[in-house]
Structure formats: C-alpha cells, structure tokens
Amino acid sequence: MAKQEVAAKKVKRPTALKRDLQNKKKRLNNKIYKSRVRTAVRSFQESLVKGDETLSKAKLDEVYSILDKCAKKGVFKLNKVSRTKSRLAARAAAKA
C-alpha cells in the first residue's frame, strides 16, 4: 500500500488577509534583525569597556556589516544606519 500524502490545498484569500500574513512575516524578520543589531552593539560596547582594541575593531566591523544588511533589506533607513555607525566610530576613537 502506497503512502497517500494529502497536500494542503491552496486557499484563495482576500487581499486584506494576504497583506496581514505578509506583514506578520516582515514584522518577524525585522524583529530578528533589530535584535541582532542590539546584541552586536552591546558586545561592541563591552569590548570597549575591556579596552581590547583588536576585539573592539572586530566587533565594530561586525556591527557595520549587520547594519548594512539591515539598510539593504529595508529594516532601517539609510540615515539611521549612517548615524549609528558614526556614533559607534566616535566612541571607538574616543577610547583609542
């Protein structure tokens, strides 16, 4: 006897419901990226407190990378990303 797999039938949805589902997905992705940014910034600030220049430089590069990805995906606006990067670079320069 062969296995019978029941495929989920596509359901025709009203546009408002579809937009709601898409917004939930986007909201979840945005939340994930924002959390990654906060975690990376926190680890960068901790490395500044420790005073390890090589570690803080690596952490700063990591934060830059995540912020650039967020700007590319539209999670943050470009101006916010630039402002955040500038402030973090200023903190790194002040500690150096």
Curated annotation (Swiss-Prot):
SUPFAM superfamilies: Ribosomal protein S20. GO terms for cellular component: cytosol; small ribosomal subunit. It comes from the Bacteria. The keyword Cytoplasm does not apply. Residues 1-27 are annotated as: Disordered. GO terms for molecular function: small ribosomal subunit rRNA binding; structural constituent of ribosome. Belongs to the bacterial ribosomal protein bS20 family. This is Small ribosomal subunit protein bS20. It comes from Protochlamydia amoebophila (strain UWE25).
